[in-house]
């Protein structure tokens, strides 16, 4: 055929009325017994100016009739060759089917388009490299149970297992049920694994039906009894949050215990927890264990609130445990919830521990989260000799060194812990050494040291004043009175020695 005719055949969408039947036939736009063929858009054809059908349906019809020329034309119009092959198989035009198949060399993409089991099998036979097992596997995927029934005796044990698993994964429930009831399967219990993997409760139900109603005992491995299997399934379902799986399993036995509830807590499945906590009257000790587990696993605020609500937010029995777990797992959400809901204060005891070993950055965030004043943390830091925290937090409060020094002095006045007070004074003195104070301020600081029995720091600042040739006799006399009044023997001795040198 000339290339011009080929171009015309491919691109003519509207035949002129004046074209006679002979010309149309010569152009190859005529379908014997049907009439003229005309392309309509990209997906349809018009037959004899009367009937519009999809191109692929026309291809199937042409294949069934064995009409090579029309098939060639429709393929030129971008029809799908798969339908021509199906039609050729339906019309028993095997040579035409093989001829068309030679252009694609893979039958498996055609199979989903076939409804008739006989044509399905004939199509699969076009691929000479495929075997019976491949045919049955594809039949299962496409709901052709009759093919499985026909060839079941030709399948090996391994093939049967593969077919059964394929049916399960493809969710072909009728085939799964039929195989479970009629064919010896090496490991039918795999249906449960696939049910959980696919989150498919229908497969789970079929598995239980086969186990309990048809008594297929090899569904359970490792000599496990049925109750143990059900409890295992309940724990799996709880850990994955599949409440509907748990309810399906409970139809056949088993019970929800602390093991299953713990699995739900561990993986933060609040829906499962809420359902069973509402329906089971659990002992308080069990609820407390679940709450402690939730703290360990850093569960969400909603899960913690749910468990606390069943305890009526009363945690007196496990207060020490909560503090231990908060410290161990570095989670403070439970403390925040208890404070907001019931004003239960666990902040103070845990803060004392946190100040002992946590970083400045962590404590800054903790301080913001619980609205804690910096001086509270500074005093706690002083008690445990965390001078680094004292310096950083005081610097956060007062940027100016002199202001910072005065700020720390005010904290010393309210500090009762002796060792903590010494840490603050030590920090103040280091800050003084790194700053420049006028003599008037130095006198004030010396009196401050005297009032708090800071002998070493008092001697140090007096020596600094002496180096500046500042008369400190009156200062020494005043501070001696303070030392005598408060009975500070070391300070008294040090002042008297200084007075002898002045």
UniProtKB/Swiss-Prot annotation:
Pfam families: DUF249. Induction: Expressed in the early phase of the viral replicative cycle. InterPro entries: MGF_505 (IPR004858). It comes from the Viruses. Disulfide bonds: none annotated. Keywords: Early protein. The keyword Glycoprotein does not apply. Plays a role in virus cell tropism, and may be required for efficient virus replication in macrophages. Belongs to the asfivirus MGF 505 family. This is Protein MGF 505-5R.
